[in-house]
Amino acid sequence: VYRNGKSKANRCFVMIIKKNDASSNRIGISVSKKVGNSIVRHRVTRVIREVMRLHWKEIKSGYDIVIVARPSAKESDYGKFESAIFHLLNLHHLLLEDDDLE
């Protein structure tokens, strides 16, 4: 995914996507030591995972998605995480249209 994927970024995250041959999505989350100590890194990881879990059905299937947290992510709250992730999903055209849901 890192080598051949398409990358988009905003202040909090870098999102890299690549089409896969599966019918479902796979997600990877990377939070380096630059973001903070282990407590901060695990919090960032948990919040990213929760945002993706709650909105999983709104994302087109068949992609490998890697989310890399930037150091500015440690200062963000859940609302900023959610809007930043949706911004990147929208840039990658991965959000389903309203009529495609269900």
PLM-predicted stretches and their roles:
Residues 1-102:
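Positively charged, solvent-exposed patches that mediate nucleic-acid binding
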